[in-house]
């Protein structure tokens, strides 16, 4: 028992001397968090994680309710460091009695602190939730409607793995025949939240693919040939960044996405970049480009539809064309982190898709009759990202 007492003293001392968050290197942060998780697992009796499983969904639900009441907006707009219950109640929707219960919950989860009774001070997380990251909660709250029906879905289908993007748990839960992306177009708030999550994810993704791929060596082309086609490229973030990094490379850059996405592009694109409305399941209009590029597109589709997309690309590639797929890769180790496996379940319930391992990505490309030339590792924190280079 003396050793546990010493451990407790050591942890207390370490906490008292931790450097500020912005002075901790990401690699060291992840290593320490991993050790904290191991320590927690070693100390907890089985009933404690069971309790946590049983109540974990309430965090998202209560934050979503607080968003609806306007709690986070009130703190962002307030000039005061903290607000009393009375002050906060005057700035939000709903009854004060309910507000007090919501705030009591959020304080327990360290979203807010209570300097004194019925006075609330936002923790850093609360201020984040008043901005773009708060849309992540709105997005996940929509996904939770599917999760709530997941058991019923598998009871009905005999516990078969979903394999078709149009027969996913999403369609079952929302009683629709639409694909998730089609449904989003009819739900402005959900679409806005999804877009924010995608933008926020881009900010966290680490190095761009062209920082680790030998672009000058591999993608030299002629001026009368399209240099790169970014399929499913949204409003052009990747091709714009590529153009800034390689302003003198010859050949046009093309960003493709559904017409309504292309129409949402704000302002003119830089010279040398053109935008084309295109459904990637239909014949590819750009033939013989030097490179065809997809970033986090195919992970939204099960093999059935992913193979169709790859077939449309393969049939227009020239002998020296290159296919570049920039994707998350699921870890293959026995000790898998929680976030990647959770994302895998999200892909399953929304799209009938999956987070593929490197081996599964290679297998998919080979079944589509591509040769994998090399797998390039992209430097990121907390996730595995790879660039798959494939040829005919």
Task: Label each residue range with its predicted role.
Residues 288, 340-343, 392:
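NAD(P)H-dependent oxidoreductase Rossmann-fold/reductase module
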Residues 8, 13-17, 93, 102, ...:
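Conserved adenosyl
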Residues 1-181, 224, 369, 383-384, ...:
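N-terminal accessory segments
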Residues 61, 198-203, 350-354:
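Short acidic-aromatic active-site loops that bind/stabilize oxyanions
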Residues 328-368, 373:
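C-terminal alpha-helical "lid/dimerization" subdomain adjacent to the S-adenosyl-L-methionine
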Residues 119, 353, 378:
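Residue-level "edge-of-site" marker
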